[in-house]
Amino acid sequence: MGLSTAYSPAGSGLVPAPLARAARRRSVQVRRPRLATVRCSVVDAAKQVQDGVATAVGGGAASGNECFGVFCNIYDLKAEDKTKSWKKLVTIAVSGAAGMISNHLLFKLASGEVFGQDQPIALKLLGSERSFQALEGVRMELEDSLYPLLREVSIGIGPYEVFQDVDWALLIGAKPRGPGMERAALLDINGQIFADQGKALNAVASRNVKVLVVGNPCNTNALICLKNTPNIPAKNFHALTRLDENRAKCQIALKAGVFYDKVSNVTIWGNHSTTQVPDFLNAKIDGRPVKEIIQDTKWLEEEFTMTVQKRGGVLIQKWGRSSAASTAVSIVDAIKSLVTPTPEGEWFSTGVYTTGNPYGIAEDIVFSMPCRSKGDGDYELATDVSMDDFLWERIKKSEAELLAEKKCVAHLTGEGDAFCDLPEDTMLPGEN
């Protein structure tokens, strides 16, 4: 049932192979769309019930879209009572979509694990010319998985096409740090990627798009991205620090001898680097302060803190590669925290824009802080948090690092010439 395709890097798109051969015989030009689209349209449920038929979605040159296999049909949903409660289609863009993190994440998104079992989604996958064949493989696996909520899959290499009208942008793709590469050079190279993606989001995405930056250094990449999107609110941008929060919860649970779900209100403050601050002062175990349960202050201040900060490096030594599955899980957790009401008295960690924050943290950077959500995709900062000298001193150290990174990328944020002075290398090994 699938449609065979021929890929032309020069055209940056896909052309059905039979059409390409026919065009050569007739000496005519076949239009090459820049996006290859796999589509199973969500149509009005009431109309489907009334018509009771499955019809083909227009494809190829006639409609400007191409479909593959089962995604070419509009399906009869009259036997599905749940169709009446299905929500409006949510469109999600994922960059670095052919990578290991995405390989775990995309199937969680398609299954309904993230947005719910009544939420149809469309996936728009961004890659490069080099990864395009791998993207086709990802598309094929998604098709073969028969997810009923997955209504469209598009693959492409241009952010202006892939980001068109998206509701969520999960920016995973970034250049890895090569041997001997200075951290300042990595900031510049990846900063240019996120500046370009920010401009594309600003031009074509939904005005209320939610952006989660995963590619490292994610805090400063998120700052660069939001500075290049004047038409999108700065509060819509997040840097992923949920994996760090999950790691901290794990260590507290292991030390206390409880299950993970008993641990709450664990905040990661600051940068996604070894200057991050896992906050045990405000954390709770079964509603009680952690320091009442774990009375070993030396362990909390030293071993616990360093274990969380260096977890990524230890993992790559053991596993031989950086975390992928746990990163995908943390992306799921981060999104669910924004689309699900936060339980009363609890909060979660995410890197957000600091301007207007109540803690005294420097403004105009992206800094991980404790947040709550009403489940509408937005958030508010938690205000009922405690500070002591130990916590505040470490927060200021991470703040200083982010301010230094900001100076390194001033040329990408519209703030003049860059000046980079990063004497200490605090990148997370294997996660850069």
Curated annotation (Swiss-Prot):
Molecular-function annotations in GO: L-malate dehydrogenase (NADP+) activity
Pfam families xrefs: Ldh_1_C, Ldh_1_N
Keywords associated with the record: Chloroplast, Disulfide bond, NADP, Oxidoreductase, Plastid, Transit peptide
Top-level enzyme category: oxidoreductase
Catalytic residues in the record: 272 (proton acceptor)
Record NCBIfam families: Malate-DH_plant (TIGR01757), MalateDH-SF1 (TIGR01759), PRK05442.1 (NF003916)
Family named by the database record: Belongs to the LDH/MDH superfamily. MDH type 2 family.
Function of the protein: The chloroplastic, NADP-dependent form is essential for the photosynthesis C4 cycle, which allows plants to circumvent the problem of photorespiration. In C4 plants, NADP-MDH activity acts to convert oxaloacetate to malate in chloroplasts of mesophyll cells for transport to the bundle sheath cells.
The protein's name: Malate dehydrogenase [NADP] 2, chloroplastic
Source organism of the structure: Sorghum bicolor
